[in-house]
């Protein structure tokens, strides 16, 4: 639908959703998510996915608050992007575990920049700039600072 009104840059990042559960949880499949209380960061992909499984969705402004509530038994699972999920698994070592979303049937999503329809010069410039950021390592540093960090 969006492709009808805008063009997109080349994808610059691929996101995968993960499920964070308590370390002793037996939740392992999509069916296990049904009727659970799922914590999500408001407005994220995890938020939209959770609504497919339950009406018990707890929305948070910050992902860390959702994980804290998981640790404290207020939610059953948290659905979140891979990188922050792995950071939380380390931060809350022994209390939570992060499970790949593919195990639950979650698909990957690509991030791209929306551009004015038909502006190939701008698309070429944006794609070139992203390629440069990736080539010199800046992109990886940005991911580490702004996506992996919480």
Regions from the PLM with identified roles:
Residues 37, 73-74, 137:
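Conserved functional loop/turn residues at catalytic and ligand-binding sites
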């Amino acid at each position: 639908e969006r492709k009808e009104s805008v063009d997109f840059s080349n994808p610059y990042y691929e996101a995968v959703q993960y499920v964070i559960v308590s370390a002793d949880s037996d939740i392992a499949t999509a069916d296990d998510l049904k009727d659970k209380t799922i914590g999500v960061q408001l407005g994220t992909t995890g938020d939209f996915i959770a609504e497919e499984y339950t009406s018990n969705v707890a929305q948070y402004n910050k992902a860390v608050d959702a994980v804290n509530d998981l640790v404290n038994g207020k939610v059953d699972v948290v659905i979140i992007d891979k990188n922050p999920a792995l950071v939380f698994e380390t931060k809350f070592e022994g209390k939570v575990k992060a499970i790949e979303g593919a195990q639950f049937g979650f698909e990957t999503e690509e991030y791209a920049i929306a551009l004015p329809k038909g502006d190939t010069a701008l698309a070429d410039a944006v794609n070139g700039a992203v390629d440069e950021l990736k080539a010199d390592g800046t992109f990886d540093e940005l991911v580490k600072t702004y996506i992996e960090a919480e």
